[in-house]
């Protein structure tokens, strides 16, 4: 049974005013028809380039914004049925670690105040019990109890992110939303924080929604991956299957974008990346409503891709892919995507 179940979720932001008083800008469809599930104690990665809608989806799960359509369920909670007020029990069950460890910590508060705040508000701890639990959380993330009396500016970026993780773990959450938790850190610090997150999951049994743009990092941390492009989830599946045998052309493009230390391999990857993306740098304009968002960049594009978004179908690896290549194109007979030459194959 799934801990989190997101069904047909859409988030549409209203367009603002144009240059002239009577002009209205079109609505922005940040997320369209998203389906995602996370089991208890499972790590699921949500990957995609900037502007794909992955952070918006995470914020909808956190109740930091209200979805336009669809449902979100967390265990017994019907999240989309809460109305304007969010129950305290849901706040305890779902916590977040933001990308920027500097901006997410109040510089006017000591670490003790930062870590203790959710303990007071949600757990009702006070006095000695509050101090003991705060010190315990600091030890859990590899910091000392004496660090509690310092301010955020006295710590490095990696230490600040550890403090943010300690704060998120204070309520013993069932689900932790990690919004690019290592993107703002240097490489050596990234590995330390990733190892910390893996250890903490084993110790706490919390489920992770790991939002990132680095597929290599997500593969290391997560059991399953969902790939998002320009408001749509285009592929889901086990992490190894997604990375070793992608079923969607955009997933293949992401994998080809991972740097390789071998110059010969890197040249081959660069050539494949350019072919897969048709030389287009990234998604531009508003996401289409009734078309595949990757159609403008896909080397295997067909006429149907411009007129309808494909219904996701099951893959052999146990995931799903939303691509017309698997329903009406050359992969209908089971031909793997890796055999399609983006330079010569006409879908």
Regions found by a protein language model. Give the residues of each.
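Short catalytic/signature loops enriched in Gly
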Residues: 2, 15-22, 27, 238-347
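ABC ATPase NBD coupling module
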Residues: 20-25, 79-95, 113, 121, ...
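P-loop NTP-binding/switch modules centered on Walker-like glycine-rich loops
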Residues: 175-177, 181-267
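Conserved ABC ATPase signature
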Residues: 151-155, 159
């Amino acid at each position: 049974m799934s801990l989190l179940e997101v069904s047909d979720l859409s988030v549409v932001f209203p367009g603002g005013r144009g240059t002239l008083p009577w002009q209205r800008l079109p609505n922005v469809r940040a997320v369209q028809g998203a389906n995602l599930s996370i089991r208890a104690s499972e790590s699921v990665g949500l990957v995609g380039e900037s502007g794909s809608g992955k952070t918006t989806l995470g914020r909808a799960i956190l109740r930091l914004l209200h979805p336009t359509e669809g449902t979100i369920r967390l265990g017994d909670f019907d999240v989309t049925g809460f109305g304007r007020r969010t129950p305290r029990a849901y706040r305890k069950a779902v916590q977040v670690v933001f990308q920027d460890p500097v901006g997410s910590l109040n510089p006017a508060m000591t670490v003790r105040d930062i870590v203790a705040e959710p303990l007071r508000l949600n757990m009702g701890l006070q006095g000695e019990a509050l101090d003991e639990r705060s010190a315990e959380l600091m030890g859990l993330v590899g910091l000392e109890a004496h660090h509690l009396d310092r301010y955020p500016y006295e710590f490095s970026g990696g230490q600040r992110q550890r403090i943010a993780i300690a704060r998120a773990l204070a309520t013993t959450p069932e689900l932790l939303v990690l919004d690019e938790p290592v993107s703002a850190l240097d490489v050596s610090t990234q590995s330390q924080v990733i190892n910390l997150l893996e250890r903490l999951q084993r110790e706490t049994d919390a489920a992770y929604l790991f939002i990132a743009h680095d597929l290599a990092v997500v593969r290391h941390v997560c059991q399953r991956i969902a790939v998002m492009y320009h408001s749509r989830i285009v592929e889901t599946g086990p992490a190894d299957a997604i990375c070793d045998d992608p079923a969607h052309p955009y997933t293949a493009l992401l994998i080809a974008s991972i740097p390789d230390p071998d110059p010969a391999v890197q040249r081959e990857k660069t050539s494949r990346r350019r072919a897969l993306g048709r030389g287009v740098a990234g998604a531009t304009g508003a996401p289409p409503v009734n078309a595949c968002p990757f159609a403008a960049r896909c080397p295997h594009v067909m006429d149907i891709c411009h007129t309808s978004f494909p219904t996701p179908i099951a893959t052999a690896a146990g995931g799903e892919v939303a691509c017309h290549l698997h329903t009406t194109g050359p992969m209908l007979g089971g031909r793997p995507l890796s055999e399609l030459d983006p330079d010569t194959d006409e879908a």
